């Protein structure tokens, strides 16, 4: 996805990270252009196992979809909850820092299915008490997509109009995928706390 690619680009340029393993369903020619990247091809991400994650210091999850792309609530849940929860299970009891992209409205009690699933996932992963966990809650993400997500595209246009009047960061202001990726890299390198949640404002203000 867009966030994942932006993250790979920044990790490639960060000397503290010597190697990057990217889990993909099929090999990407674009990823082959990065010197640090090794692609781990797994058609079903639920088959990711201990051997695959051992030896890593950080696990970044930018995995997510939309109800429209998934086609059903069940398919959406399988991607956004089950795969991310599986990754969290794998890194538990290992010296691995998990960094997870969630959503601004994540709330297990939300009447909105998307936000509810995001909240349930956050609650589950927090309950694992991982050695180190970062959760990022961005608002709408700005970036070019190969697929058209009309609501998000409309949101980007509306927020860009609002920004002309309100230049200071505010809670719902959209962020670029590059800024989110930058915040994740900064968190990976500097976070001291065992658990920290980065809200949309924190993401905007990270330098």
What are these regions (language model features)?
Residues 1-58, 180:
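N-terminal Rossmann/SDR dinucleotide-binding element
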Residues 9-10, 14, 65, 69-70, ...:
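N-terminal Rossmann-like NAD(P)+-binding domain of SDR-like oxidoreductases, especially those catalyzing
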Residues 13, 108-207:
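Oxidoreductase cofactor-interface core, primarily capturing Rossmann-like NAD(P)-dependent enzymes
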Residues 30, 69, 108-109:
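Glycine/Thr-rich phosphate-binding loops of Rossmann-like dinucleotide-binding domains
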Residues 36-86, 90-93:
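NAD(P)H-binding glycine-rich loop region in Rossmannoid oxidoreductase-like domains
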Residues 73, 78-120, 127, 133-136:
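Conserved Rossmann-fold NAD(P)-dependent oxidoreductase catalytic core, especially the SDR/UDP-sugar
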């Amino acid at each position: 996805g867009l966030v994942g690619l932006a993250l790979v680009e920044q990790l490639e340029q960060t000397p503290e990270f010597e190697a990057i393993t990217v889990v993909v369903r099929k090999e990407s020619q674009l990823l082959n252009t990065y010197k640090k990247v090794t692609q781990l091809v797994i058609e079903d991400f639920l088959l990711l196992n201990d051997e695959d994650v051992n030896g890593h210091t950080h696990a970044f999850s930018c995995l997510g979809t939309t109800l429209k792309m998934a086609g059903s609530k069940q398919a959406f849940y399988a991607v956004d909850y089950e795969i991310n929860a599986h990754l969290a299970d794998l890194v538990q009891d290992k010296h691995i820092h998990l960094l997870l992209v969630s959503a601004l409205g994540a709330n297990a009690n939300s009447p909105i299915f998307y936000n509810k699933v995001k909240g349930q996932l956050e609650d589950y992963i927090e309950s694992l008490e991982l050695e180190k966990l970062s959760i990022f809650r961005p608002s709408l993400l700005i970036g070019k997509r190969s697929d058209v997500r009309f609501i998000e595209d409309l949101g980007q246009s509306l927020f860009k109009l609002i920004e002309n009047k309100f230049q200071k960061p505010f809670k719902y202001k959209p962020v670029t995928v590059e800024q989110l990726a930058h915040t994740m890299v900064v968190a990976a390198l500097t976070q001291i706390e065992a658990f920290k949640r980065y809200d949309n404002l924190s993401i905007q203000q990270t330098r």
